[in-house]
């Protein structure tokens, strides 16, 4: 990860299920400044759709989604 892609904040939402990951992601983004990066870790498969929908709904940029061993990593720019 390059320096420009280093997250300003990380959320560990492993073990949480809907609606907690979306709620906590929205809450974190509301507390962040424009242009900052948020990294979210989750393992609820519903987050694949829910986080993408949240990003579209609130107008933030979903930079990447990666999956490894059932854990998802979302990188979001506010």
PLM feature segments, named:
Residues 73-78:
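Core SAM-dependent methyltransferase catalytic element
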Residues 1-2, 36:
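N-terminal pre-ligand scaffold of iron-sulfur
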Residues 13-66:
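Amphipathic, hydrophobic secondary-structure cores in small proteins
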């Amino acid at each position: 990860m390059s320096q420009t892609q280093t997250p300003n904040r990380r959320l560990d939402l492993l073990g949480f299920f809907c609606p907690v990951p979306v709620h906590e992601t929205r809450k974190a983004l509301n507390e962040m400044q424009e242009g900052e990066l948020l990294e979210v870790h989750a393992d609820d498969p519903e987050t694949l759709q829910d986080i993408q929908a949240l990003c579209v709904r609130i107008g933030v940029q979903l930079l990447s989604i990666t999956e490894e061993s059932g854990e998802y990593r979302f990188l979001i720019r506010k």
